[in-house]
Amino acid sequence: MVNPLTMKAEELKDQTEKLAVLWVSGDRDVAEKSCLMYTHAAKRNGWFDEVVLIVWGSSSRLLAEDEALQEKVRAMGKDGVILEAYIACSDQLGVTEELLELGIDVKGMGVPLTTYLKEGYHVLTY
């Protein structure tokens, strides 16, 4: 079994270069100090070729209500992070329009998430 912690950078290049981050927590500290920070850095620093942020559940409400987090997400989108959100949750929470205004692709996420998993994306959940 390959241990990615002991691999050299060149060896890591042979591994999957795609990351999907599933953001479900409504906790602001988790959002600011872990989820959004790492996700943005992963794209900006080229750690992954493709980085997807999926807003799902209570994170939808947190993002819709927090202007500082909105600015972070806008910057992530400008830097190439793919922004998606699960419409069933955002509709239930009444925040779909706010997410759309941030440039987030709000849609059914069952099939896209399943595709990410089957295509070997690295998946982080916050």
Protein language model features and the residues they cover:
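Histidine-anchored nucleotide/phosphate-binding helix
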Residues: 31-45
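Aromatic- and Gly/Pro-rich donor/ligand-binding loops
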Residues: 124-126
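A short aromatic-anchored loop/beta-hairpin motif
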Residues: 74-76, 100-114, 121-122
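Short, basic, glycine/proline-bearing loop/turn elements
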Residues: 55-59, 97-99
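Acidic, glycine/proline-rich low-complexity segments that act as flexible tails and inter-domain linkers
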Residues: 2-12
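A glycine-rich helix N-cap at a beta->alpha junction
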Residues: 67-96
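Short, glycine-rich nucleotide/cofactor-binding loops
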Residues: 15, 20-35, 58-64
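Short internal beta-strands
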Residues: 39, 50-56, 83-89
